[in-house]
Amino acid sequence: MLQSLKNKLKKSAFIHGTYMRLKRAFAQELVGMTSKTEQDYFAVYGEKTYSGKGEIVDLGCWLGSTTIPLVKGLLKNPAFAESNRKVYAYDLFIWFEWMNESAAGTRLAGKYKEGDNFVEEFKARTKEFARRIEIREGDLKQIGWSGENIEFLLVDAMKNWDLANAVVRDFYPSLVPGESIVLHQDYAHFFTPWIHLLQWTFRESFAFAGEVPKSQSVIFRYENKIAGELLNKNYSFESFSDREVDSAFDYSLNLVSTEKLPNVAAAKVMWFLHQNEREKAKAEFENLLKRGIPLEKDLFVVKEMLEKE
């Protein structure tokens, strides 16, 4: 009932915009698709954890709510502040209609239409730190990476298989065993189930390093080098059997806290919905409920999707 009410309120532009404006003011959040807890994590990581043994890469920076706290924290850290390193900020910088919800309650509401370029907005928001940010505008599948070691890889760009394969192929080879951190910002989001299959595939190389509360972000430490044949493979739905899907999601569900269980469970349902296998999706949804996963958050979202013809 509560989740249904929240969804209805979101459909009112005025109510949703007012709520988002008050929420950001109260929590002192930057405008973006990140929570205050995520923004705080990036700042603390930059200040306290970064060691200077590799580059910092932000895949999917949008309006800078990941980039800005990262740089603010890093500038308090001599390993970054006394170096010539920059944060590499990747984005298409092309506006899509679904972004309007995150812009609600700001001067950006209604400013951009589908297909507009907003890189100047990013530059305006990050101008204080411009000399420590290198903007990589465009399709990361085409831009790629230069090959330098990466110490911190923030991934908010695995929105489909092509992008996921590009991140694995172009960025994972530059991770440093025992040093690198990978933060998956969509790990606990229903739409991106391939993240779970890939992290399970690479489970011998990554160690779970925690999660960011009140967010969809989960953190991994890179421990062992991934075999070249695994990095160069072109993954797809067809790459995995149903048994492997079960194993991958059992792995993920055992990693995360109770807070994130409904969203990870929803991603498993979405694995089948993405392939138009509705009966399998419905059966999986029922199985997850029988396992005691609460019907809330993203699991409620996929329930509504299953109820639509």
Listing of model-derived features with the role each one plays in the protein:
Residues L2-K53, S65:
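Class I SAM-dependent methyltransferase Rossmann-like catalytic core
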Residues Y50-K308:
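S-adenosylmethionine/decaboxylated-SAM
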